[in-house]
Amino acid sequence: MQLMSYRTEGGIRIQREISNQPYRPADNALAGALDTRRGVLFSSSFEFPGRYTRWDLGFVDPPVVFTARGRRFMVDALNQRGRILLDPIAETVSALAATTVEKNSANRISGEIEETKERFPEEHRSRQPSVFSVLRALAHLFASSEDQHLGFYGAFGYDLVFQFEPMQLRLPRPDDQRDLVLFLPDEILIVDHMRQSAAIHRYEFEVAGTSTSGLPRATPHDPYRLNRAAATRPSESDHGPGEYAALVERARAAFARGDLFEVVVGQLFAEACGDLPSVVFQRLRQANPAPYGALINLGQGEFLVAASPEMYVRVEGRRIETCPISGTIARGRDPVEDAERIRELLNSTKDESELTMCTDVDRNDKSRVAIPGSVRVIGRRQIELYSRLIHTVDHVEGMLAEPFDALDGFLSHAWAVTVTGAPKLWAIRFIEEQERSSRRWYGGAIGRITFDGNMNTGLTLRTIRMQDGVAEVRAGATLLYDSDPEAEEAETRLKAAAMFTAIRGPVSAAACMSFTAAVGCGRKVLLIDHEDSFVHTLANYIRTTGAEVVTMRPQLARSELRHGANPDLVVLSPGPGRPADFNMTGTLELMVERHIPVFGVCLGLQGIVEYFGGSLDLLDIPMHGKP
């Protein structure tokens, strides 16, 4: 056990205790607890050198939650421990300009951010009054370089962009929509899969002589609720067949006018789900490992289950980085087909154009807050392999200029071009005009802002929103003038497919087999080996049908056939040289005489052709090993 104590910039004294835990079951137990208790589990189950490692961290029963919708915000104490923190929080927020604050009860303060009438240069857009002003003030209240894990954890909704870029909204917003839910924990489980270690960090807070020490950590339960009426709800989308393709055509018209260069438009899929969020999360994590996996109990019966492949913004010290993803193709059935798909993706000029444009916009986002000359691409069109998809990814970094911080970097990218488009402001307007429903959390971010000034967030993609027995998945495609409407509609459905596999339950391995194992059962195959380097691979392929396969060199095979061997099939293997080098004519005479079916591969086929009167010639360029 390790103990330490420190004082934050806002004068709060914090005592931290670190205790080691058993490695294996740690995160599984936490996932189950989240079915009934508010909190977060972030899980990175994907590795990429210099970018991602495997870890889990999370908690339940946070003492404080910060929520916002539009320009209104609330800070709630969820237990007596949180009430101790509410007074310094209220004092800090009340000192902000353009902010009205009231303490509604011993457990809640609320307020509203006034829209600014001040003019400002674009470089300072991230400093206009918004709910992020409150978040920045609270981060300063708890700020300290002594700890790298304490901070705000949760979800950032898509509509937060309208505090950065205000505009007229067309789509109605659901009454229960929230734009921001962030928890302040007092106990964090941290699992390092590289080191195979786990530990719990526990925090006690002292404010003006009053401490949380000894107070219970529990908070009221907020379980997942199943709605019986939802159990019979059919699968549905907010676009009918062909309607998304028609939307693509409208986007192409905007490209032709020069209104847009690219835009990411999505459709929403929904269906009943009777399983608990933790069950769906475990299935999704197993089937679709990702660097930004998450299970979040947001409270009010709302859950997010995520397997996001894309970093949104990560800040460590003054370094800010992003990893834009654009360019997608389905995985192959095996590594050989994967290689073919990767080649196809890398040779696609459309996909290259998509990613180039995304990265150009991303570099522009950083340039608003970065030291001149520090923004650079450190990885170009790198391949990342996921369960069903292959992506091309760029890696971009910069150095934050003074006085900007991680929140400035976060806001300057709102939202990533890979979920909006370019020019970004016009793309966001197009999305508001053309999509059928509010995005809620989709296209926003999940992650944490730690009080040491760092940040790690992933884009809210490949994410299931669960509430009242209904699971929702939103998926989009990056549209360009060259887009094929039907192909783009198919891409959105492909992206959603992995999510619905987790929602509906696992598919058995037998159902995924591309052949019927019984077709060769009871059959005997003689494979004649012409000194080839691939004969045993060929034999194994045949055995997968259930057939019994025996491999022999030509002389032994002919001897066995003369002495009564009676296979159901003889396979003549590939090999070097010419058929005459192996007396293939003598072998085939026995086949014809005995009426035994024969199948030839490469050299074997050549021997059959010659035996029945055909002729062979040499190619100008040998083709062995070429596709």
Segment roles from a protein language model:
Residues K524-D529:
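Conserved acidic segment of CheY-like receiver
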Residues G564-P627:
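Cysteine-nucleophile active-site neighborhood
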Residues Y23-P25, T544-L561:
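A short, well-structured beta->alpha microelement
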